[in-house]
Amino acid sequence: MKEVVIASAVXTAXG
């Protein structure tokens, strides 16, 4: 599920 990978990347970027 790419959505999970994207969500993880976004969370990291955001953080």
Swiss-Prot record:
Function field: Catalyzes the condensation of two molecules of acetyl-CoA to produce acetoacetyl-CoA.
Lineage of origin: Bacteria, Bacillati, Bacillota, Clostridia, Eubacteriales
Protein name according to UniProt: Acetyl-CoA acetyltransferase
Any one GO molecular function term: acetyl-CoA C-acetyltransferase activity
EC assignment: 2.3.1.9
Record's keyword annotation contains Cytoplasm: yes
UniProt entry tagged with the keyword Transmembrane helix: no
Protein family: Belongs to the thiolase-like superfamily. Thiolase family.
